């Protein structure tokens, strides 16, 4: 049920996205996320969707595999859609039954919000799928570097963010194992009232928390055994350098800003 979660995983490769500098990818993700929230009409969202699909092709990864990153949040997206259809009012009334109405603004907001969530998750998945944990950590550290001058532990922050991303598929896999084990013991997570289903989650939550703390402790012990000192005196075999690929990323970023700004109403 939870296997093959794409977000948080890294798939080695030699594609354009794999070989681009992690700093340029991180900066582009921030810019793209901003553009997602600035988009407010069909044309701007169509442009962003088209670009996301093209980026997926550039990664040379299976599109179906990338789309699996939406699996863990499809319930959240569905809930958001229903919530906006019920609450947001305005415009043409499409359907009415007593006090309940489905109106133009509600449908519009439901579609746009679900697209925002989906695009954010997909573009974030492309980042982790095409960037190794080491490169991602170093890229974050280099971008946050100026904060180190005022005493902020930049390396530790970058490492924590990288580990948090990489723990997502691990915890999802652990959740899947626990669900299968509880199902084998007779637990039922697919039927019954909402309250009963919530109670059935307790046998999953407790072992999952225990497993998460155990894995965190094992990771801490492994880092300590290898002499981890927070990046003090650390050297690097391969230093990050900007290439022509990053120039293309910069040009594409400028073009996207201009196009979205032009079509935004």
From Swiss-Prot:
Single annotated GO MF: transmembrane transporter activity
CDD domains: EcfT
Annotated localization: Cell membrane
Matches recorded under InterPro entries: ABC/ECF_trnsptr_transmembrane, EcfT
Keywords in alphabetical order: Cell membrane, Membrane, Transmembrane, Transmembrane helix, Transport
Membrane-traversing stretches: 29-49, 73-93, 110-130, 143-163, 242-262
Origin: domain of life: Bacteria
Pfam family, one: CbiQ
GO CC field: plasma membrane
Membrane topology type: Multi-pass membrane protein
Main location group: membrane
Functional description taken from the UniProt entry: Transmembrane (T) component of an energy-coupling factor (ECF) ABC-transporter complex. Unlike classic ABC transporters this ECF transporter provides the energy necessary to transport a number of different substrates.
Similarity comment text for this entry: Belongs to the energy-coupling factor EcfT family.
Subunit structure, as described in the record: Forms a stable energy-coupling factor (ECF) transporter complex composed of 2 membrane-embedded substrate-binding proteins (S component), 2 ATP-binding proteins (A component) and 2 transmembrane proteins (T component). May be able to interact with more than 1 S component at a time.
The name this protein goes by in its record: Energy-coupling factor transporter transmembrane protein EcfT
Upper classification of the organism: Bacteria, Bacillati, Bacillota, Bacilli, Bacillales
Gene of this entry: ecfT
